Every structure is written in structure tokens, then in C-alpha cells.
Amino acid sequence: MSLYIGLMSGTSMDGIDAALLELPSNQLIHGITKQYSDDVRRNLDNLIMGNHLTLASICQLNTLIGREFAEAVRQLLIEIKVHPKEIQAIGSHGQTVCHDTSGSIPYTLQLGCGHTISSLTGITVVADFRTRDLVNGGQGAPFAPLYHQQIFSKVNESVAVVNIGGIANVTFIAKNQMTRGWDIGPGNCLMDAWIYKNKGALFDKSGVWASQGEVIHPLLEYLLQDPFFHLDSPKSIGKEYFSLSWLQKHLKPDYTPADIQATLLALTAHTIAETILNESGEIKQLYLCGGGAHNTHLKENLARLLPGIAVKSIVELGISPDYLEAMMFAWLAAQTINQIPVNLTSITGAKSIAILGAVYPIIKSY
């Protein structure tokens, strides 16, 4: 038995998920979510929205996020009463602030200094996972299908898993076939940004506000014309693309805020449903994970758009939808520490298998 910690802050930027994972059983021992401090959250919002931040402030933010990730580890270990020396390594995703693979020089950047996390926790850290995939010819995202493949390793039927974070991504798993996956488009990011702008709330709990509005069909049809939705896989996208500025250029003064929220939920539902339906009727089970798995109204919309397909939360398999990605980075850290390459060729389009991440070791005293 080996213990690893995974740290994840996704494109929703709603906090840091920390998961203690036992391997090789893939059992979640404990998980917590630590909210970002107000200063860090504000600076991240400004950075993602393209507001001016100095190079010095971005460098400071890298260290501050590292400190917050380390504090999440400290809180996790205190709650579960585990000593840092019992942990083999931490897998830290960091906080994505930009990700764009559309140009001749693809790039991705996750903040959260690995040296800071390692120094403050006394635990070896593996971080900067996505860059290795980019230089290997991949999209750098999504990685979730790798871990979904582990969970459904004994699958006897075709299933789809959709992770609804800030960006939604899909995994298709079938017996005796290569696992495939890619980014679909906006998951929660536009709904979160819109409700924050209008109501000051971080997210639309259960989709209640969206359920009070009416879908603006001309707006929905216009949004669905965005070129990203029509790209072939593999493909990936960042939250900075599907931003409020992307949305606001399509809005008209007579649109009500609640109706816009309803339309944004419909956009997420329609793009997910179309992705599933394009699998030619093979899929009979759709499992949802990520924060969007708690959105009752979104789940109802998906069930309506996908007749004949059972739409479920991954919690029905005894797996936490909130900590699945953090668990994945704990698992990825174990692969890196043990020099085990992973295969993203059918997911991100990588040219070959690769060992992901950079290792930030500690010096152990004996």
C-alpha cells in the first residue's frame, strides 16, 4: 500500500481539491476543498479576464498559489491524522491561467510553485504535467480520460464519462478499444461567471437560477456556431477563450439575466448531448463528474436530450464526483515517481507514450 496526495484547482477556480489516495487500490481515503483567499481569487479573475497584471505580480501569484496548495495538504493531513513522511509524493496540477494549442507555438501555464509546495510540506512534488504532453505533440488536455480508464478497466459495455468543470470534457470507454477523449467546450465557466457578475454568487446551485429563465433560442443557435464546437478531435480549450467577453459580444439589451443563464446552461447541455449522440448509438450509460454533476437542472436537460441513455452521477459507483480529478493527479504522480509512462495518443493526440511532469524532490534525512 502506498499513499499519494493529489491537488487540483480546475478552470472553475472555486478552490483547491486535495485527495489522499491509496494505491494500487485507487481508494479515496479522505478529501477536502480549500477555498482560495480573496486576494488570490481576485488576481486570478483579473488574469483570466485579460486585465493587466505586472510580471512581478504574476510571479508573486505563482508563489502565493503554491503556499495555498501547501496549506491544503497541511489541512488534509491534520484531518486524517497522517504524517507527511507516510506520503510518497504529491501530484499538483496547479492553477491553469492560459491554455491555447491553436497556433504554431502551443502553450499552457499552470501557476503554483512546486518548490514552494515541496518545501512547505516536506513531501516530494510532481507538477507541470501538461507541458510534457504539449512537447510530445499532444493537446495538453484533457487528462481525465486516463483516470476514467482506470476506474472502468473492467467495463463490459460502452460508457461515456463527462467531467463538467469550468470546461467540460468527455471520455469514451469500450471493451477492447482505445480510450478516447477531448474537451467539449464550456462546462460551468460561463454560468459561474454570469451569476457572479449579476448576483455575486460563485455558482448557480442546482441550476436554480437557470431554471427560472427561458432559453433564448436565437442566442443559443448563434453560440453553437462557434468554430471550436466544429473542430475534429483531439481538441482542447481554455477558460480564457469561453469568457464573459466572448459571451457579451453576442448579447442584446433586451435579454434578461435569468434568460441568459438558462441559455448558457442549454449551451453546455446541447454540446455535451451532441458529443454523446455522435457516437452512433453505442453509448447507453453516461456518468457525470466534476462540479456540474451536482447541477440538477443540467442533469434533467441532458436526460431530455439523450433519450434511451441513462444519465447518472459517478457517485452511483461509490466515487466522489468532487475529488475525482485530484485523485487522478495523485495517480499520475505515482506513475511519474515509478517511471511508468502513460498513453495519451488516442486522447490528446500525443505522438508516443510519455512520463509526465517535473519532480520537485525533498532531501530525506536518515
Curated annotation (Swiss-Prot):
It comes from the Bacteria. Gene3D superfamilies: 3.30.420.40. Pathway: Amino-sugar metabolism; 1,6-anhydro-N-acetylmuramate degradation; Cell wall biogenesis; peptidoglycan recycling. ATP binds at G10, T11, S12, M13, D14, G15, I16, D17. Keywords: ATP-binding, Carbohydrate metabolism, Kinase, Nucleotide-binding, Transferase. Its EC number is 2.7.1.170. Disulfide bonds: none annotated. One of its GO terms (biological process) is amino sugar metabolic process. It catalyses: 1,6-anhydro-N-acetyl-beta-muramate + ATP + H2O = N-acetyl-D-muramate 6-phosphate + ADP + H(+). GO terms for molecular function: ATP binding; kinase activity; phosphotransferase activity, alcohol group as acceptor. Belongs to the anhydro-N-acetylmuramic acid kinase family. Catalyzes the specific phosphorylation of 1,6-anhydro-N-acetylmuramic acid (anhMurNAc) with the simultaneous cleavage of the 1,6-anhydro ring, generating MurNAc-6-P. Is required for the utilization of anhMurNAc either imported from the medium or derived from its own cell wall murein, and thus plays a role in cell wall recycling. This is Anhydro-N-acetylmuramic acid kinase. It comes from Legionella pneumophila (strain Lens). The lineage of its organism: Bacteria, Pseudomonadati, Pseudomonadota, Gammaproteobacteria, Legionellales.
